[in-house]
């Protein structure tokens, strides 16, 4: 008798779930859509982009406006979405916490995909690739031509804090001293002042510096010594926004738009007159 009552109860619960399940799932789906970053952007009419200044990813021109590869990417994304774009300059060391607290909608700032970062944020498919290189002082690093030459306790490297350049320096030149700076420009100024042996940074900025200050600086190695995928970063749990961003990136890649923009900003100096 008790077994019969138990089975009857199970049957009633199953029937109840079958009737209410679709409705509940529909409500849950609607709630998720309402709370998605994509929906918030469309309602607000503004795409808020977190970024920091890195030449030539993002920098200010002579009039004080932001220009650069990432700036073009974010502007085109906003245009295709039918919204305006708002850039939120943020110190790199605190850019992920700022995203997580809702200061902006997405990071479009040359952020490399890293395991520790991926534990805090979700990354889209890559829209670009970058790599680490070095520019060195002729006075302090004359004759240096390999990572081994810089992997010495007396060598000092200037690096922007919070960047993948810090990890690259630790991995490939663990013996060298690392001097960290909040701003990329400060690191390069320290190199030009002759206070460090080299700057470790994302290509192509080191090559630009070596060409601009060829009397005092040089490239110890012709090629990058790392390669890393670059992606948008967004808050976890936002599936709709992730799918949209991935689709947009793939479309722009298939159209050749991303490749054209990459060549302009990284393969030429046609933009130099905007900032110099």
Can you describe what each PLM-predicted range is?
Residues 26-35, 72-80, 138-141, 148, ...:
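Extended ligand-binding regions for polar small-molecule ligands
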């Amino acid at each position: 008798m008790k077994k019969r009552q138990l089975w009857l109860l199970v049957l009633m619960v199953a029937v109840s779930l079958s009737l209410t399940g679709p409705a509940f799932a529909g409500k849950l789906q609607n709630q998720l859509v309402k709370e998605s970053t994509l929906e918030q952007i469309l309602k607000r009419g503004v795409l808020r982009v977190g970024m920091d200044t890195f030449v030539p990813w993002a920098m200010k021109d002579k009039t004080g406006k932001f220009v650069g590869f990432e700036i073009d990417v974010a502007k085109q994304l906003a245009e295709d979405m039918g919204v305006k774009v708002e850039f939120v300059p943020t110190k790199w060391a605190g850019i992920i916490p700022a995203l997580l607290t809702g200061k902006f909608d997405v990071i479009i700032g040359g952020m490399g995909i890293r395991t520790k970062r991926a534990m805090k944020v979700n990354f889209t498919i890559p829209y670009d690739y970058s790599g680490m290189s070095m520019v060195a002082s002729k006075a302090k690093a004359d004759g240096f031509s390999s990572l081994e030459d810089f992997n010495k306790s007396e060598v000092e490297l200037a690096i922007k804090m919070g960047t993948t350049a810090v990890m690259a320096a630790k991995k490939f030149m663990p013996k060298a001293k690392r001097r960290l700076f909040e701003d990329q420009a400060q690191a390069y100024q320290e190199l030009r002042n002759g206070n460090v042996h080299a700057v470790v940074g994302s290509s192509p900025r080191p090559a630009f510096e070596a060409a601009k200050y060829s009397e005092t600086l040089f490239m110890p190695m012709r090629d990058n010594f790392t390669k890393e995928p670059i992606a948008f970063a967004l808050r976890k749990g936002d599936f709709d926004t992730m799918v949209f961003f991935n689709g947009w990136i793939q479309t722009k890649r298939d159209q050749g738009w991303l490749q054209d923009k990459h060549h302009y900003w990284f393969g030429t100096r046609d933009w130099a007159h905007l900032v110099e």
